[in-house]
Curated annotation (Swiss-Prot):
Alphabetized GO MF terms: proton-transporting ATP synthase activity, rotational mechanism
Key word Membrane present: yes
Matching HAMAP family: ATP_synth_delta_bact
Disulfide pattern: none
Taxonomic placement: Bacteria, Bacillati, Bacillota, Bacilli, Bacillales
Any GO CC annotation of this UniProt entry: proton-transporting ATP synthase complex
Organism: Staphylococcus aureus (strain NCTC 8325 / PS 47)
InterPro entries per the UniProt record, alphabetical: ATP_synth_OSCP/delta_N_sf, ATPase_OSCP/d_CS, ATPase_OSCP/dsu
Bilayer topology annotation: Peripheral membrane protein
Protein name: ATP synthase subunit delta
Keyword presence, Cell wall biogenesis/degradation: no
PROSITE patterns (UniProt xref): ATPASE_DELTA
Length: 179
């Protein structure tokens, strides 16, 4: 189903670019995703209910999403017609990926053993942008005492690990090779 969601996201992304609505559509999709992310199971039930017609599913969309961008509403109608309303979170993720790629940006999770100061965060973000060649990094911070010290950054599938825990694991591996 991820492939299906990717197709919807790509179509919406292309329309967003063509109509110069990329920012608006991204903002509205973010709000919609927040609103429905805990209701995916209920949306699956709507999708799989054989007694509910496409028109009834469209009415549901009209009732819930009153003042949304017409391109998003049209996509939601297509999702409803094809019994794919429950894919909206996957469509959002795929759209975000396209959006981030377009602006050469990505999300980064920075883990440390304590709350980092703004100066420390700025240094880490600078390092991450240099290492990943991204123009912008959107940061989420987490405190992880298991790291012992230092920090670990996850950007997509890339992990930059400057933690004491990682240093100890590497040292342990070297000792095992010697023995």
């Amino acid at each position: 189903m991820v492939k299906v969601a990717n197709k919807y996201a790509k179509a919406l992304f292309d329309v967003s670019l063509d109509t110069n609505n990329l920012e608006t559509i991204n903002e509205e999709l973010t709000v919609i995703n927040e609103a429905v992310k805990d209701k995916i199971e209920q949306l699956r039930m709507v999708d799989s209910n054989p007694t509910q017609t496409a028109e009834q599913r469209r009415e549901l969309i009209n009732g819930v999403f009153t003042d949304i961008n017409p391109y998003i509403k049209n996509m939601m109608y297509v999702l409803a017609d094809n019994r794919h309303i429950s894919l909206i979170a996957d469509v959002f993720k795929a759209f975000q990926s396209l959006y981030n790629g377009h602006y050469n940006q990505d999300f980064a999770t920075i883990e440390s053993t304590y709350e980092l100061s703004q100066e420390e965060l700025d240094k880490i973000v600078k390092l991450v942008t240099q290492q990943t060649k991204l123009s912008k990094v959107i940061v989420d911070t987490k405190i992880n005492p298991d790291l012992i010290g230092g920090f670990r950054v996850k950007v997509g599938t890339t992990v930059l690990d400057g933690s004491v825990r990682n240093d100890l694991v590497q040292l342990q591996r070297k000792f095992r090779r010697v023995n």
